[in-house]
Curated annotation (Swiss-Prot):
Role according to the record: Component of the cuticle of migratory locust which contains more than 100 different structural proteins.
Protein name according to UniProt: Cuticle protein 16.5, isoform A
Top-level taxonomy: Eukaryota, Metazoa, Ecdysozoa, Arthropoda, Hexapoda
The Sequence repeat ranges on this chain: 17-20, 25-28, 31-34, 38-41, 44-47, 51-54, 57-60, 64-67, 70-73, 77-80, 83-86, 91-94, 99-102, 106-109, 134-137, 144-147, 151-154, 158-161, 165-168
Source superkingdom: Eukaryota
Domain statement: The tetrapeptide (A-A-P-[AV]) repeats found throughout the protein are also present in many proteins constituting the protective envelope of other species.
GO molecular function: structural constituent of cuticle
Keyword annotations: Cuticle, Repeat
Originating organism: Locusta migratoria
The UniProt record lists the keyword Repeat: yes
Length: 175
């Protein structure tokens, strides 16, 4: 599953309760069966949701402002990205290509290398199914002992690994 939310270390000075999910509210944390992030609050179900930078997901991830939504893939918006079983980039001009989990990027820039992706400003680099998003930076390792790290406030969980820091994105395959 994209979000097996097995939570690793959390760098929060606030309250944290995570039986099956986590809710972060700048920098407070409450748990549900998923995770939700909203400016920088976080709430989710079996996936992750972030808002402003907002992200919401079910079996995938959705981010908004920069917004991202995904099912078995990932979608980012503003820079916006939406995913299906492949990857589609629409960045002014728009770019589309198919990949493993599908991703759609819209603005500002996207560069793709092999199964990896390089997204600039906010920047995203994707190599295999791993992802790193910076400013608020996000690092996402989809197949590797999944873990997520959110900085400011910071979050670390193991499901698909994600690191959100400040907004740049890089995807890496941990194969």
């Amino acid at each position: 599953g994209l979000l097996g939310l097995g939570y690793g270390g959390y760098g929060y000075g606030a309250a944290l309760a995570a039986p099956a999910a986590v809710s972060y509210a700048a920098p407070a944390i409450a748990a549900a069966p998923a995770v939700s992030y909203a400016a920088p609050a976080i709430a989710a179900a079996p996936a992750v949701s972030y808002a402003a930078p907002a992200i919401a997901a079910a079996p995938a991830i959705s981010y908004a402002a920069p917004a991202i939504a995904a099912a078995p893939a990932v979608s980012y918006a503003a820079p916006a990205i939406a995913a299906a079983p492949a990857i589609s980039y629409a960045a002014a001009p728009a770019i589309r290509y198919a990949a493993a989990p599908a991703i759609r990027y819209a603005a500002p820039a996207v560069a793709r290398v092999a199964p990896a992706i390089s997204y600039a400003a906010v920047a995203v680099a994707r190599v295999a199914p791993a992802l790193s998003y910076a400013a608020p930076a996000l690092s996402y390792a989809r197949y590797a002992a999944p873990a997520l790290s959110y900085a400011a406030p910071a979050v670390s969980y193991a499901a698909p690994a994600i690191s959100y820091a400040a907004p740049a994105i890089a995807k890496y395959a941990l194969h």
